[in-house]
Amino acid sequence: MTATIGHFLQNLCGEYSNQKQAFENPPLFAHIFLRYKPIEHLQPGSILLEQTYAVDPKHPYRLRVIRAEELTSGIIKLWNHTFKEPDRFSSATFDQDCREKIREEDLILLDHCHYQVRQLDDGFHGELEPGCRCIVRRDGKETYLVSSFHLQGDELSTLDRGHDPQTHDRCWGSIAGKFHFQRISHWAENIPETWL
């Protein structure tokens, strides 16, 4: 792995909450936890991503494995994977035994749903690869995902929206702008030294 990826993962890994935003604007923003935990026994750069609502912390509504790879100097690609059986690994973020059972064959690569990340003066900026080809089925309808994030220090902002493939109108996602998360736990110490 490269120094660029190591630096990115050290900045990323941890637990984040948008509690302040959710409490100030409860009709517009749910209280959500984002968690990024290294999966040491998989390929270098493999991170477990969990998203849960604060009201239901033991049942993630999104569970992914992202894998960081530097394609060209300074540009990181985050390969995005889902689980064949996500319920088997719903406790993996905090349960090491469960996490150690994750195997490559448990994962499904999500075509066209990978991120490109660049480090700029104000932190790391990530965007879904262009092309409007990351298809998300929501409420019985196919939409394409437009997604971005900005990581600076202990602050992480994200914006995910689904659009109609024909009209390009927004079908779902935040109507009030970005979600703003604050890191509440650092997990960089869980990154294997061989990754850095």
UniProtKB/Swiss-Prot annotation:
InterPro entries, from UniProt? CpcT/CpeT, CpcT/CpeT_sf
What general EC class does the enzyme of this chain belong to? lyase
Key word Electron transport present in the record?
A: no
* Keyword field: Lyase
Q: Which residues form the signal peptide?
A: none
Family per record: Belongs to the CpcT/CpeT biliprotein lyase family.
What is the name of the protein in this document?
A: Chromophore lyase CpcT/CpeT
